[in-house]
Amino acid sequence: MQPAYYEDLEQIKNKIWSMLDNAIKDRGSPFRIPVFICGNQDDFDGRIVVLRKSDQSNNLIQYHSDIRSDKIAKLKFNKNAALLFYDKEEKIQVRLKVECIVNHNNDITKQSWLKTGHMSRKCYLVDNGPGTESDTPTSGLKSELDNFEFTMEQSEAGYKNFTVIQCKIISIEWLYLAAKGHRRAKFDLENNKEHWLVP
């Protein structure tokens, strides 16, 4: 038996947002770690990010990053990007086209930083930015920080590297895999249009 949203566009949209919202709370949700793809025709790549916020009222999702990451330079050159989600159990793939805003040292980052846990802040304490070449295997952290004993006060030094990437959703493509017959739909949020697609 197929789910209620199998042939109902409104229920599909509700299901997508429900999965995004749930991913914020559920660390085990496959939608919590989408692939984020950015760049241009000559230089683009993808990486896993951790979903930190889902805001249907503003068609927005967001994640955190290091200002020194190479994706920040890519986004400053081209704010258009894509995210890919897949849930094997639900048999649902979701593709988002988004426009990105890089927030650094502003009210948005301050609010998010206050909610960022002690251990999560460790990522932003590395001396050199992510992707910097090294002659030896390294975490990038000073020896006194390369453990679980650093203090919350010490973690504050990472704030200068902390960014919040807000992704304004332009369109959503949904694919449901079913033996009876796959279903695919597109939601154009910019123009408030939706239609079925051949899978």
Features from the language model and the residues they span:
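Binding-site signature for planar aromatic cofactors or substrates
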Residues: 1-199
